[in-house]
Amino acid sequence: KMGPVLCHLVPYAQGLAVQVSTITLTVIALDRHRCIVYHLESKISKQISFLIIGLAWGVSALLASPLAIFREYSLIEIIPDFEIVACTEKWPGEEKGIYGTVYSLLSLLILYVLPLGIISFSYARIWSKLKNHVSPGAAHDHYHQR
């Protein structure tokens, strides 16, 4: 049956999708920041672009791996003679639940707080650059001055 395989695969695929999306949005914000704020710098080469994409997927795969590793596919007895199949998280030393909590908190920081800060900073710098930008030839045009 596919139950045990999907028990490990589905949470991993979900986590991987979220993580690679978050990292990709952060990389896009950083690239836009670089292109607008430092527009005279050289372009990123194709090789570097592929390296960044590969790193985004690799880091995402690594960060999502605990979602596949720490799973348990088992029968749970609800009442005598009635069992259900369940796919649950099974962290080592689960009596205190510390590993699952640590993973969740680190995921919150790495996948929400840090990208939010980086993206906000990048777009704030872009906004500041564009707000203070004067187009060539428009410096003496009173219509464009604010």
Swiss-Prot record:
Cystine pairs: 7-87
Swiss-Prot/TrEMBL keywords: Cell membrane, Disulfide bond, G-protein coupled receptor, Lipoprotein, Membrane, Palmitate, Receptor, Transducer, Transmembrane, Transmembrane helix
Subcellular location: Cell membrane
Transmembrane segments: 9-29, 50-70, 101-121
GO CC, any one term: plasma membrane
Main subcellular location of this protein, as a coarse class: membrane
Side Extracellular, residues: 1-8, 71-100
Membrane topology: Multi-pass membrane protein
InterPro entries cross-referenced by the UniProt entry: GPCR_Rhodpsn, GPCR_Rhodpsn_7TM, NPY2_rcpt
Gene3D superfamilies found in the cross-reference section: Rhodopsin 7-helix transmembrane proteins
UniProt keyword Transmembrane helix, yes or no: yes
Cytoplasmic side: 30-49, 122-146
SUPFAM superfamilies: Family A G protein-coupled receptor-like
UniProt-listed Pfam families: 7tm_1
Record-level Gene Ontology MF annotations: neuropeptide Y receptor activity
Function: Receptor for neuropeptide Y and peptide YY.
Family: Belongs to the G-protein coupled receptor 1 family.
Protein name: Neuropeptide Y receptor type 2
Organism: Ovis aries (Sheep)
Lineage: Eukaryota, Metazoa, Chordata, Craniata, Vertebrata
